[in-house]
Amino acid sequence: MTNLLEASIEQAGYTSRKKVLTDVFLEVRKGELVGLIGANGAGKSTAIKAILGLSEDFKGHIAWNDCSFAYIPEHPSFYEELTLWEHLDLISTLHGIEESEFAHRAQSLLQTFSLDHVKHELPVTFSKGMQQKLMLIQAFLSKPDMYVIDEPFIGLDPISTKRFVDMLKAEKERGAGILMCTHVLDTAEKICDRFYMIEKGSLFLQGTLKDVQDKTGLEGQSLLDCFYKAVQGDRL
């Protein structure tokens, strides 16, 4: 299976002169959804920044292998003067999407996430949930080879969560790779093919759910139970 992303992070980021992240190595393959999980402050966001080329004091190597990608950040951000539709039109222009195809994709996504009625309004006035849905729409619009997603479930209602998960599954089937950072382990357990667990700035556990269960000695138990045992005990 083709690797879309190969990340070798020897070190990245500093807090009070201390390295935030050391010796994290991960890869994402075509048609695969990979979960990046860890406690608050473990170094997940620093890993994402390093992968995107935004981390200070980075040492290592990031290989995208000629693939396009879309980034969905944890905190939505929009141009104050642009409407929802103008945001989508800008993305379409940047990615060279033909006008007819853009209109079809945009309208379909707006209907899926129930934002069609506000497409000519300013996103900066939207609720957190509506802004989060627009961030998802912007990423899905370009149909990239890979997605890097940071805490996507924050602010989403149950219906939007279900539709988002369905979209991820469809993109996987299309062949897209997905790296998703999340605290929502019950959902991650159901949809992720593999996991990378970061604790105290280092990669300490990785593999499929079965691998994680075997390494923690919790056969048949939930990802949350395995994660709790792993971070509370010795590194495995």
Curated annotation (Swiss-Prot):
Q: Broadest EC class? A: translocase
Q: Where does ATP bind?
A: G38, A39, N40, G41, A42, G43, K44, S45
MF terms in GO: ATP binding; ATP hydrolysis activity
Phylogenetic placement of the source organism: Bacteria, Bacillati, Bacillota, Bacilli, Bacillales
Q: Which InterPro entries match?
A: AAA+_ATPase, ABC_transporter-like_ATP-bd, ABC_transporter-like_CS, ABC_Transporter_VariousFunc, P-loop_NTPase
Instruction: Keyword check for ATP-binding, yes or no.
Output: yes
Per its record, how is this protein called by name? Uncharacterized ABC transporter ATP-binding protein YthP
Alphabetized, the UniProt keywords read: ATP-binding, Nucleotide-binding, Translocase, Transport
Question: What is the E.C. number?
Answer: 7.-.-.-
- The domain of life is Bacteria
Family membership: Belongs to the ABC transporter superfamily.
Report which gene this protein is encoded by: ythP
What PANTHER family does the record point to?
Answer: ABC TRANSPORTER ATP-BINDING PROTEIN ALBC-RELATED, ABC-TYPE TRANSPORTER ATP-BINDING PROTEIN ECSA
Residues in ABC transporter domain copies: 4-225
